Structure formats: structure tokens, C-alpha cells
């Protein structure tokens, strides 16, 4: 029997849980931020908007502190830290800021997390401007900004079903072994359209067994054939690359990566090889995902689905509202066309977009419509109905 609950009691309780659970987490102390906003306008007049300074999340006594005081330098090479890699650009900046905020808020030891932020060389906002904005929003954050040279990959990119998937920065994950400091042996890669509502250390502690290079939630019930064109499957040789494997779909927006094995196996080159084949013969339509499936599918460390409740941005064409997968949630992912900050500002949010909103540090210039509230639908089951996320 499936119980149905009023939205006001069920989802409000869930939202309150997401907002306040860090206050009761082991080892975390929260110091309120100043109610001031930081903003940046780049030289060409592109306005990045204003962001409110985040509360300061500090380690509690239970944590093994990685620095004795705020002035101490925290090295990007420190293997005792949790290392998270994300991209940083003007278009998705608001999502990246919210993602970082959510991880700090829910981390058991927030000062033990180091963020490796990758910015495009020719973004409307320079890497320096983006770095300054991150520092102003999170004054005590452990992070480093790396510059991604877009000409590294731009000639390998083929057209996709959605223009956003053609952004060169979307391919930065292919080059993490080259971009990040050589001393970084392991990293969690996360897309910018996520929020984490659990302790990121739990994901970090994932073991990559055997010879596996990456770990990610797998979805073996998905129709794997649709990620490649009929030209791929009709080719006499190409489907044979899956021979001896049981390939399953996985989403590359959440991955635990062993960069030592990645570099040793030259996996960047393996991904580039498939991109070169794609330029000669169209074998897929979905941007940076299919090369990862071709190289890794069937040899991925399976991580609990709770760590990538993906597809919340809807499909790649309409961006329609989606429901949650069944089961517990540690990470919500707005993969697909629709992004929560865009839909909220346009006053047409999907129900789950309101779970992203508490982590948004953007200084809002658009007043939320009163009829677009957290209680815009009738039952919790509307959030958890079965639906296709692939």
C-alpha cells in the first residue's frame, strides 16, 4: 500500500530537514555570515550578479583539523583532505556556489574539504574574477582555481542535441588528470547543477576495487542502446568494443576517480580517440557522455543510487518537471535542460526546485511570485512517482 501525504506536512518537513540537519551533525560548527552581498561586473559589462556571504562552517572538536589557524596554508596536495573537482563559469556560477554551500553545510568536517575549481580561459568572466567572487562568498574556503584551455578540446567537439552540451568546459572532466596538480591522486568530480544533502566524506570513502578507475551510480535497467546512433550499432566493428563487458548506463556528473590509474592508463587519450571517431562517423548525440560509456561502461565501481538522484532538469529538449527516484537521497542532480535557478527566476519552478533554493546565495533581484510556493502540489507521491530519467 502506498501512503499519500499532504505536501505541507511532508515536503515542508523534508525541506526543514535539509536546511537544519547540519546544526546537529557531529563535528560541525556554524558561524553566521555577514548580511552583505558581493558582486562582480566584468570588463565587457557582463554582470555576474551579487552573492551573499555564506555562513562560516568550521570543524568541531571531533574533527582532525587540517590547520591550526585560519592563516595556515592548506595544500591542494594534502591526501588527508576530501578533494572535490567542479567547473566554474559565468553561466553556471550560481549553481556552483549553491553546490559548494550545500557540501559545506552537510559535511561533518567542512574544513577538511578542498575544492578544485576549473575555469575556462575565455569565459566572459576571467578565472581571476571568478576566483575573487568565490573567495568573497566563502572567505575561509579551501580551494584552487585552474585554467582550462578550451583549444585543447574544441576541435574534437561534435554537435549535440543540446547546445549546452557542446560547451568546451563540459569536457574538462576528460582532462582532470592533466589539469589538477600531479600530487592529487584521487578526486570526486561533480557537475555544477547539484546539491549534496549528506556528508560528502561518505562518498569520498568509496573503495575502487580491482583495477577500476572510476566509481558512479549505475543504471543497468536503462536502454543502453539509445546512447549511440544506429550507425554505431550497424557498424561491423564498433559494437565489438563492448565484447566481454556488461555495460550499464552511468551519469558522469558524479564520479569518484583514481587519478593515479587514470594517468598511468592515459585515459584522456582513450576518450579523445572516440571523439575523433565521432568526427568522422556520427556514432552518438549526447556530448561528453558517450565516450565515457565506451571506455568505462561495464568496469565501473557501483555506488549507491542515493548519490545521484539525477534527471531533475527534465529531458534535453523540453526540460519538463521530473520526480525523484525511489529510495533515499544524498545528492540531487538537475541534469537535463531545466536548471532550478532559471526556473525559479522565471517564476515557473518545478516542485523539486524548492529543495535547491535554501542553498542559493544569489542576491535575488526578482521577487518570487506568491503563487509559486513550496506547497504548489497536493501530495508527496508527486515527488516520487516512477519516471524515466535517462
Curated annotation (Swiss-Prot):
Keywords, comma-separated and alphabetical: Cell wall biogenesis/degradation, Glycoprotein, Glycosyltransferase, Golgi apparatus, Membrane, Signal-anchor, Transferase, Transmembrane, Transmembrane helix
GO molecular function list: polygalacturonate 4-alpha-galacturonosyltransferase activity
GO biological process: cell wall organization; pectin biosynthetic process
EC number: 2.4.1.-
Glycosylation sites: 205, 223
Top EC class for this record: transferase
SUPFAM superfamilies xref list: Nucleotide-diphospho-sugar transferases
Keyword flag Magnesium: no
Membrane topology, as annotated: Single-pass type II membrane protein
Domain of life: Eukaryota
Pathway info: Glycan metabolism; pectin biosynthesis
Lumenal side: 32-390
Name recorded for this polypeptide: Probable galacturonosyltransferase-like 9
Gene: GATL9
